[in-house]
Each structure stands twice: as C-alpha cells, then as structure tokens.
Amino acid sequence: TGEIGQDVARALRSRGLGRLVVTSRRVERAAALAAATEGDAISFEDWPAVLERVGVAIFATSAPGALLEVETLRGVMERRRGDPLFLIDLAVPRDIEAACGGLDSVFLYNLEDLTAIANENRRLRESEIEKCRLALAERAEHFWLRLRP
C-alpha cells in the first residue's frame, strides 16, 4: 500500500485486471487502496491463505527479509493442485525466497528479471523502428524516382 503498491494496483486495474486483493500491516491503508481500486482488503496475517486462490501475487513491502519462504509456498502449491502461480517481487530486499521460483507451476519474477524483460522488449522495438525507417526511405526514393521527368 506504499507508493509502489498503489502505482501497481492502479496500473493493473486500468488494464482490466479483475478484482484485486490488497493487504498491509496497516489495515486502514489496505482498505483505502482496496476502495480506490474496487478490490478487497484482507488482514496482513491472512495473505498466505490468499495465495491458494489467486493467479498472481505482487509483493512490494519494506520488510527486512523474505516474507514468503519456500516451505510455506510448497504447502500452498500442494493445495493448488498444479494451478500456476505468478509471483512478482518488487521489494528490496526481496520479499520472496529465490528458491520459491524452483517449485513446479511457480513463475517468480523480481526487479532484475523485469528489467531484463523491459530491456529486451525495448531492443526489439528499436530494431523494428530501424526496419521501418529503412522501408520508408526505400519507398520515398522509389516515389521520388517516379516523379522525375
């Protein structure tokens, strides 16, 4: 429910994501963000149980260490019976133990992963822009040659 959490929640809602489940150590902050995004607020103690029923969980706390440990997630995943779970860890230090990404049907992304994905996408876009420039230059030259007497 900090600045990052608010920005992410609003961005997801603006892109059509369904109902958000919001939690915070401070209940009033969770309630305010849930109301602003037409979501549901839950107590901070209940977040592990919610992992059993969501498809994506985004962590962005200021906790001094990992909140989600591999043993906890292993139990969650057993109860999910193979349903995939996408975990996005925006926290520094990380909220999710790296070993969680090694569990079956868990897809864990952290800031470094997201940065690498964004950089690759930017590189691909720049490559396509260059292809378009070359195609436009070729067509402009062809058009100019046709106009010459």
Which role fits each region the language model picked out?
Residues R74-P149:
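Adenosine-phosphate binding glycine-rich loop
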Residues L17-W47, L67-L68:
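Adenosine-nucleotide cofactor-binding segment
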